[in-house]
Structure formats: structure tokens, C-alpha cells
């Protein structure tokens, strides 16, 4: 417990919380350009080929972003919208690409959780 004199001299410093998505610079989403689109393998107990893209954001920061959903149309120089949100089994992937925004198409034949994948309502 500090004395009154110590508090007068130094004061209390507030705890600084570290942001989980620093490249977004406080924005909910940021636009960027794909520099490389490739697949990578997840951490130990899981096995798959996860689709990821290297994206240069508008601030000049380059990040690795996950491409969610089944199938995608992204290639180099595609303009994408990037949001925060990590992928637990891919180390270093702390961002996701928003489906159905800018150059990214929505997932085809998606019936549930459509808004997350930019899928339009299917006509009867």
C-alpha cells in the first residue's frame, strides 16, 4: 500500500489494454489489396488446407487474413474488406475477410448464417 506522499509524487497509472487487432487502428473494418492468396495448414490436432490471403491495408500495414466459407473468387490485386477476428488454429492470422463486400463474392448455396457470408436470399 503506497503512502499519501508516494501517491502525490507518482500517482496511479491506468492499466493500458492491448488491442487484439492493431492493424485496424481502432476502425471496425479496413480496405486492402490482396498481395498473395494461398492455403496453409492448421496447428497440431487439426488437419486441413485453410484459405488465407496476405493483404496490404490502406495504412500500408500488411496482414494475413482468413477467407471464410466454401470457395472464393479472390486473387492477387483483389480489393477486400478486412475485419478483426482471429482463427484459433492458424498462428498469426488475426483478421478475416468480409464476404460479399467489394471484390469478394458471397458464398454460393448458403442457407443458414447467410449475412456472415454475404449470401443473398435464394428465390423460390
UniProtKB/Swiss-Prot annotation:
Entry-linked InterPro entries: NA-bd_OB-fold (IPR012340), Ribosomal_uS12 (IPR006032), Ribosomal_uS12_bac (IPR005679)
GO MF term list: rRNA binding; structural constituent of ribosome; tRNA binding
PANTHER family in the record: 30S RIBOSOMAL PROTEIN S12 FAMILY MEMBER
Parts of the chain that traverse the membrane: none
Subunit text: Part of the 30S ribosomal subunit. Contacts proteins S8 and S17. May interact with IF1 in the 30S initiation complex.
Residues carrying 3-methylthioaspartic acid: 89
Protein's UniProt name: Small ribosomal subunit protein uS12
Role description: With S4 and S5 plays an important role in translational accuracy.
Annotated region (Disordered), positions in chain: 1-28
Keywords: Methylation, Ribonucleoprotein, Ribosomal protein, RNA-binding, rRNA-binding, tRNA-binding
Superkingdom: Bacteria
SUPFAM superfamilies: Nucleic acid-binding proteins
Similarity section: Belongs to the universal ribosomal protein uS12 family.
Biased composition (Basic residues): 9-18
Designated gene of the protein: rpsL
HAMAP family per record: Ribosomal_uS12_B
Signal peptide coordinates: none
Stretches of the chain forming a coiled coil according to its record: none
Amino acid at each position: 500500500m503506497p503512502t499519501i506522499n508516494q501517491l502525490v509524487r507518482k500517482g496511479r497509472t491506468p492499466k493500458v489494454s492491448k488491442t487484439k487487432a492493431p492493424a485496424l487502428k481502432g476502425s471496425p473494418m479496413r480496405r486492402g489489396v490482396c498481395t498473395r492468396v494461398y492455403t496453409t495448414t492448421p496447428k497440431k490436432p487439426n488437419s486441413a488446407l485453410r484459405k488465407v490471403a496476405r493483404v496490404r491495408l490502406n495504412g500500408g500495414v500488411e496482414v494475413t487474413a482468413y477467407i471464410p466459407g466454401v470457395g472464393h473468387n479472390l486473387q492477387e490485386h483483389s480489393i477486400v474488406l478486412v475485419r478483426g477476428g482471429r482463427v484459433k488454429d492458424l498462428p498469426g492470422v488475426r483478421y478475416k475477410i468480409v464476404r460479399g463486400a467489394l471484390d469478394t463474392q458471397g458464398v454460393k448455396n448458403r442457407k443458414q448464417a447467410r449475412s456472415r457470408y454475404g449470401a443473398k436470399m435464394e428465390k423460390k
